[in-house]
Amino acid sequence: MSGDTEEVTRLRKPRFSYEENQILIREVRAHYPMLYGAQSRRLSVAERRRVWEGIAAKINAITNWKRTAQEVQKRWNDFKRRTKEKLARVPHSTQSGTAEEAMTAEEETIFAILGPGVMPGSSHYGPVTHLGAMDFNPSGPGSSSPETSLSAPCAPIEAPLLLHPKESPSPTSQLHIVQLPHLTPSPDPSECPSPPPPGSGTPLLTPSGVAQHYDPTVAMLRAQQETAEAIRHLTYTLRQSMDRLTNVLAAILPLVPHQPPESPTPSGILGPVYYPTKTEPESEPCCPVTYEEENGEDGGEEEIQEVIAEPPRSPSPPPPNKRKRFGYLSQRKRRGRWKNL
């Protein structure tokens, strides 16, 4: 069983040595813009893999074990993870922590490469001078130029993270500079006023001057005055225009001849107009057929002469939904009642 354990142990590669870690940190710092910076978006995955392969080749040049690009990248990710975890546990100043929580030189270098964005709660601290950021960088002849160039843009935010408990003379001096204009008399107009310190706002403005420039009541009163003046001017213009129009009408009316109103003549009066209306024919009280009996001279033959009166006009058809009913005197359709006579 022990032989199997030794066999497994032999197959595992040794840990990264100090020299390998230094080469890894130095090469990642040199190629950081291409791997994680602004240029990484323009590079493809294959191009970034070739960068990691170049870093692995430089590490393999000093060791007998061959590191792959994936192993080198994993080692760098472990560095970042451990540095972030220690920053979360350690106080904002490395000098106030214990020996176990103090950051090593490698971790400080990695923190300088990554910037203050990896620090939890870094957005709660305000900007400070560049001197505190320079104190954080590890002193060394070989790490001056690249590290300074990378940490310089992030200097205003790095300082409060690590140098907060130390004495800070610069904010006190700024406070005195801010209070001096209030205590000293007004300067000579011929002299050029010194620019206010950064972050102090506008200390030269007195409270009365600020109230005079930003008082909403004064601005409202001015707006009301301007509106009243505009209304007064418009009223005067309208009155003047109405007076001129009245004078013009008074001058024109005498020149127009007077014409009496035309009265309508009797011949022009139209009589009432009657429109014909449709009426139904009156029903005849008697039967439309009359019979006359004449006695002839030929021996008493009776000749019946049928006289048919002119049939009246048929009335207008009733509405479709109304049933027509016949009365006692209303006309009915003959159904051949007198055909045999």
Curated annotation (Swiss-Prot):
Biased composition annotated in UniProt, kind: Basic residues: 321-341
Presence of keyword Disulfide bond: no
Biased composition (Pro residues): 184-200
GO molecular function: DNA-binding transcription factor activity, RNA polymerase II-specific; RNA polymerase II cis-regulatory region sequence-specific DNA binding
UniProt-listed InterPro entries: Myb-related_repressor, Myb_DNA-bind_5, SANT/Myb
Disordered as annotated region, ranges: 84-103, 180-210, 309-341
Any one Pfam family match given in the protein's UniProt record, by short name: Myb_DNA-bind_5
Example of a GO biological process term: regulation of transcription by RNA polymerase II
Protein name per the record: Myb-related transcription factor, partner of profilin
